[in-house]
Amino acid sequence: MDTDARKEFLATIALLATTTGSACTHQMEVKNLHEFSKSTTAPRQLTIALEDRSTSPEERVYFDYVREALAVHPAVRSVKVLPDAPADFAPDFVVAVRPRADYRGSWLNYFITVPGFLLFTHAWNGFVYRADLVTELALSQPGTAPGAAFPVATDYDMRHCDFGRGFWTSSGWYTPGYGALNALIGFWMVRYDDDATPEFQAQVRSAYGAYIANSIVEMTEADPIHRDASVAPLGPCG
């Protein structure tokens, strides 16, 4: 094969690989998003002070989703985050929020990679991932220590395949060995893909925030801690 023919052959392979990889992606899909939905009302309009107990930027993302949902909740008049609440802010409740997320892959991803690549399973099904979120909520009266943390679990079942994973999984079609390389690639595909997290967060943002916000309002109804009028408003440090 002369030089020009070799260049043309390599260019064709590169084009095929890029086209196949880009076509074999699967948009983020949260299969059980509908499971985490609840509606609630409160007998009065609440004012809530939030204490951010997140310990990482990722946890803070989920905390912000909760804050956003409370800010538009029909049972909440006002919500502020400590210690930035105004000195004259007198909340009905103080709620400490600590979200924790655990992301996991699945051994099913091995079989999606091989022999699944033959049917482009990674494109029409996506790889299988889980995101187990546990949000710890502690309710208290202003000026008192928070009560015991109450965990709220939201375990999400998702499907996703980005360009990178689609490219390597599809490589079984254009690499030597009739997909033998996929037998090795499959082990790498088993683990969770961190690149899926931003798309997952965007998809659950509204539903997760609303679910936790409703859980907080339910806590105030189930175990009401009526604000003592003698308690001074929270200062900038709570």
Indicate where each model-derived feature is located:
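Sec-dependent bacterial lipoprotein signal peptides
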Residues: 1-24
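Ser/Thr- (and often Asn-) enriched beta-sheet segments in non-cytosolic proteins
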Residues: 29, 45-49, 78-80, 90-98, ...
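Extracytoplasmic/periplasmic, Sec-exported soluble proteins
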Residues: 54-58, 62, 125-129, 192, ...
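Surface-exposed short loop/turn segments
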Residues: 94-149, 156-174
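Extended amphipathic secondary-structure runs
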Residues: 140-153, 198-237
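Lipid-handling modules and contact-site tethers
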Residues: 167-210
